[in-house]
Amino acid sequence: MELFAYGSLIFNRVMYAVTGSRYDGRPARLPDHARYLVQGATYPGLIPSVGSTVEGVLYSGLGNRAFRLLDRFEGEHYRRSSVAVDAGNGVVIEADTFIFKDDYQHLLTDELWDSGTFESAHLTAFLDEYSGFTWIDT
């Protein structure tokens, strides 16, 4: 199965910390969506947004165990949904991603999430906060 990652999971170190496995990712784009910072957090929420495009990473070869871990990691504010991802060169691939639920969208700020800022200012602390996540028995 495929995963379109757009937030902290675009970083291999986070993906490994959550799933305990390494996956090859490739750049991809999700049209008609936008990602905004969640209030009081350093990670984003993804919502539909006509005309906007989100840059991310497409991971392939994930199994059920990996998705169970990802479901837990993402938590109650997100729902896993199937989306059509632009994988480049005119190739569109069906992948799962995590959409911020309508009931929680009031928790999103007006600030678009920036991967470079997250990587330089927050990635290390984020990994420290979520270290040991993979011990969860699925």
Residue ranges and their predicted role:
Residues M1-T138:
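Glycine-aromatic micro-motifs
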